[in-house]
Amino acid sequence: MEKKAKPGFWDKKILGTAVKGAFIKLNPVYMVKNPVMFVVEIGAIISLALCFFPNLFGGNNQDMILYNSLVFIILLLTLLFANFSESVAEGRGKAQAASLKQTQQDMQARLILNGKEKVVNANTLKKGDIVLVNMGEVIPSDGEIIEGVASVDESAITGESAPVLKESGGDFASVTGGTTVASDYLKIQITSNPGESFIDKMIQLVEGASRKKTPNEIALSTLLVSLTIIFLIVIVSLYPMAIYTGIKLPVSTLVALTVCLIPTTIGGLLSAIGIAGMDRVTRFNVIALSGKAVEACGDVDTMILDKTGTITYGNRMASEFIALDKGNKNYLIHYAILASIQDNTPEGKSIVTLGKDLLKEDLDTNDIRENQFIEFTAQTRMSGVDLADGTRIRKGAYDAIIKYIKNIGGEIPHDLEDKVNNISKLGGTPLVVCAEEKIYGVIYLKDTIKPGLVERFERLRSIGIKTIMCTGDNPLTAATIAHEAGVDSFIAECKPEDKIKVIKDAQSKSKVVAMTGDGTNDAPALAQADVGIAMNSGTTAAKEAANMVDLDSDPTKILDVVEIGKQLLITRGALTTFSIANDIAKYFAIIPAMFLAIIPQMQVLNIMHLSSSYSAILSALIFNAIIIPCLIPLAMKGVKYKLQRSEKMLAHNMLVYGVGGMIVPFIGIKLIDLVIAPLLTMMGLG
C-alpha cells in the first residue's frame, strides 16, 4: 500500500511558518495551556527582569547581569524550540488543508428548484437541496445520488487517479464535495449544511482547530504537572535553607535548576507527538475525526473484520450452476437469471452474465417491468422476483431458502445439503434457487483471500490482538475461509445486530474494539466500536457514525491504523521515559556545582567534574534546550514499531530511552562544558 505524499519535514515553507509560529506562541495566553512550558516562560520573565534589576530580590548582584542574561537567552531558546516543534507538526497539516481549500474556491452549483436549474454559489447550499452535476463539473458538497450512474474522480481528496463508479441506491450512492464527475451526470441530494461537509471537517482537523487533548495526553499532562509542582516546592524550600546556611544562591540559578529538573523535554514535544500521530494516519489516506480515535487504535486488542472486502477481495462471482436434477439445469439457470436481472451487486451481475453464456436460447426479459422484485436484506438473507404470472422465484442462503420452502409447504431435496456442504468446504458461497415450492439447485460463488493476510494475522496474534471475522455466509463456508485466512474466530450468518452484540460483549470485558464498515446497516456497530473506520465509498450514515474515514475505501487499512496508534503510544512513552531519565543526569550536573564550595561532601556526587558552578548550570540549561529540536524528527516520525510482546517491547525501550536517557545528558553536558568553560572564563564567569 502506498502512502500519500505529504510535505517533508525540511520543507522551506513549513519551516518558515513554524519559525514565525514559535514566536507567536510565546503569548502567555497560549503558553498557559502547557503548564510545564508556562513555568519555563515565567522563569524566563524572572531572568529578564533580573537583567535590568539585578537587586530585585535583595542583595548586591550587579555582577550577575551577564549571567542573568545568558540564563534568559537559553530559556527563551528553550521556549522557541518547544513552540517550533508544535508549529512544524501543525504546518504539515496546514499545508494539506491549503490544498483541500483549493477544491472549494469559487465553486458553482446547478440547484434544481421547481424543476428548473439555477446556478448558485456552492457555499449557499443546505441540507436537502438537489443539484445536477454534469460530466467535468465538481460536486459542490457532500450528498447522496438520487439519479444517474457516473464515474467520479476523487483524486482531489484521495490522491487516487482511477475514477470510482457511483450510482443511486445501495452503499455506493454517497459522494464527497470537491470530487469531479468524470462521465455522464448525477443528480445529488445535499446531506450537509455550509461548514459541515466532509472537506470542512478535514480542514478543521488538519489545521488543528478542533483538536482536543486525548485522555492519555490529559493523564500524562497531569503527571508532568505533578512532577513540576513537586520540583517547584523543592526549589522554593531550597532558597530559605540556602540563606540559613549562608550559601549564596542567585535567583537565576534557582530558575535554571527548576527548568532543568522539570520534564521540559516531553513537555515541549507532547503536542507535536499527538499532532504528528494524526498526520501519520492521514499519510495512509485515513482521516481521523479525533485524536482520541488514533490513540484508541494503540489500545486495540479485538478486531471485528468483515470477510468481504477485508479478508477476501469481495468479488464473489458465479462459477457454476449445480442442478439437483440434471434435466432441470436450464430451468435453474433460467430462474437464477430472472431472480438476478435487477440485482446490481457484482454477484447478481455475474449470475446473469454466466447464465446467458450457458443458455443456448435467448431469454426474454422485455417484460421485467411487470415483475415485482424482492431486494436482499440482512434479515431475510434472500432476494428474488414475483413474476407477472404469479410465479415466485427466490435465491439466497441455504437456511433462509429452507425456512422459506417449509413455510409455503414445499419439500427439501435429500441431496441439497450435501451439495451445499461441498461448496462450503471449498471456501465458496452457495446460493440456493427455488421457484414456487421446488428447489432447482445451487449457484456456486467463488471468492479469493487477499495475499499476505495469514502472516499479518499471525503477527497480530503474537501481540495479543484477537481477530474476529463476520460474514453472512453459512457456518461451513465461514469456517473454511476463517481457517484459510488464519483469524482467531468467526461469526457466520452474521446480521448487523450480531456485530453490535459482539462489540458490546468484548467491551464488557474491558476490551478495546476496532471494526470497519461501509453500509448504513454498519452504522450502529461503527458508532459502538472504540475505533470505527468507515469507507469513503460507503453511505453518509456510516461515515457520520465512524470516528475515522478511509479515503481509499480499503478495509485492510484497519491493520495499518492499529499499528500507527500503537506507535503513537510507544513514542509518547519512550520520550517521557527519556525526559525523566534526563533529569537524573542534570541533577548530578547542577546540585554538586551549587553546593560544593560550602559542602565539600558533595564531591561524592560530582562525578562529571565540570569546570565551575556557572559552567555546570549553563551547560545543563543549554543541553536542556537543544535536546528538544534534536528530538523533533523522532517525535514527528515516531519510534520504530515492531510487532512483539509488550514485555519485550518495554524492556527494549527502557534500555534505549531509559538508560540512554541517562547516558546521553552526561556526555552532552560534559561536551558543552568543555566548549563554554573557556568562553565563560573570558567573560569573568569562570
From Swiss-Prot:
Belongs to the cation transport ATPase (P-type) (TC 3.A.3) family. Type IA subfamily. SUPFAM superfamilies: Calcium ATPase, transduction domain A, Calcium ATPase, transmembrane domain M, HAD-like. CDD domains: P-type_ATPase_K (cd02078). The system is composed of three essential subunits: KdpA, KdpB and KdpC. It catalyses: K(+)(out) + ATP + H2O = K(+)(in) + ADP + phosphate + H(+). Mg(2+) binds at D518, D522. Its main location: membrane. The chain crosses the membrane at residues 37-57, 64-84, 223-243, 255-275, 588-608, 616-636, 656-676. One of its GO terms (molecular function) is ATP binding. ATP binds at D343, E347, F376, T377, A378, Q379, T380, R381, M382, S383, K395. It is a multi-pass membrane protein. It is found in: Cell membrane. HAMAP family: KdpB. Gene3D superfamilies: Calcium-transporting ATPase, cytoplasmic domain N (3.40.1110.10), Calcium-transporting ATPase, cytoplasmic transduction domain A (2.70.150.10), HAD superfamily/HAD-like (3.40.50.1000). Its EC number is 7.2.2.6. GO terms for cellular component: plasma membrane. Part of the high-affinity ATP-driven potassium transport (or Kdp) system, which catalyzes the hydrolysis of ATP coupled with the electrogenic transport of potassium into the cytoplasm. This subunit is responsible for energy coupling to the transport system and for the release of the potassium ions to the cytoplasm. This is Potassium-transporting ATPase ATP-binding subunit 2. The active site is at D306. PANTHER family: POTASSIUM-TRANSPORTING ATPASE ATP-BINDING SUBUNIT (PTHR43743:SF1). Keywords: ATP-binding, Cell membrane, Ion transport, Magnesium, Membrane, Metal-binding, Nucleotide-binding, Phosphoprotein, Plasmid, Potassium, Potassium transport, Translocase, Transmembrane, Transmembrane helix, Transport.
